[in-house]
Amino acid sequence: MKVVIKSYEESNEEIKVVFSSKFGEGIALWQGAIPKEGNSYDVELEIPNLLKWGKDIQGKKSNCFLIEILDNKVCFEGTLESISEEDGCCVVRLGDSIILLETEGVPLEVQSYLRFETDNIILYENNR
């Protein structure tokens, strides 16, 4: 996913960034060298939390892709592309990007529109 770093803050050996993408804005921990504000980066986005269907993940009727900050959490809207019945891992599509999620509970049907929220996101810069 392409993101632009709007700002960053260092504390306790962690780098927290505010980023924007063509789908909206979010907040995440940054892994790697300190990013430059205003620069564009190709990143991999990790959600390390186990998300629960019906609580952290909800079905949506709209078919838009979105990232937004709401009540100190980052909310994503996308399409459920696939899910593993064995371990609950699923792939969510946001435009031309995908996000892998670990989930538990009864999932939506593949190709459903969904919204999920988390307060734990890690961005890794992709090596070119």
Walk through the language-model features, giving the residues of each.
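Short, compositionally biased
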Residues: 54-70, 128
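Residue-level recognition of well-ordered beta-strand positions that form the cores
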Residues: 18, 44-46, 79-81, 93, ...
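Oxidizing extracytosolic/periplasmic lumen-facing domains
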Residues: 77-80, 88-89, 105-110, 126
